[in-house]
Amino acid sequence: SQYVYSAGSDSSDDSKSNYYDDAKKLVKRAGKLEKKEKIDKAKKLYSQAFKKLEKAYSSEKKNPDILNYMGYTSRKIGNFEQAEKFYLTGLSIKPDHNGINEYLGELYVQTNRLDKANERLDVLKNCNCEEYKELELIIKTRGSKVY
């Protein structure tokens, strides 16, 4: 969701949404490092992003996008149990969230729960979206294609 602030607003007023934006930038940078196989550096950025997401979440408990990124960053640093909790909390707010359904499916592939991954794929089947195609490929290749 977008936030609009009046021109006279104090910078501290909009810092909450900036945590989320900053976290997204860190995630993007971490993804680029991962592609270059700089995994340790990527994990550090994912951890930094997670800390910013926690701050964003503290003021926006009902934002499924923040929960999606919290799940994503947790999964990327190897904390699968925590990631699953964030994804499931996000789905309890917005069950048809394409990103959460895809990433939760990827987590299920990573943790050898293909039946559950296929359930997420089934939720996405009518979305006509990239998330469906990506999860379908990951399931078919058992995760040999990048998560």
Stretches with model-predicted labels:
Residues S59, I93, L124-C127:
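Structural marker of alpha-solenoid helical repeat scaffolds
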Residues S9-N18, N118-Y147:
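Terminal, low-structured helical/coil segments at or just beyond the last alpha-helical repeat
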Residues N63, H97, C129-Y132:
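Residue-level recognition of tetratricopeptide repeat
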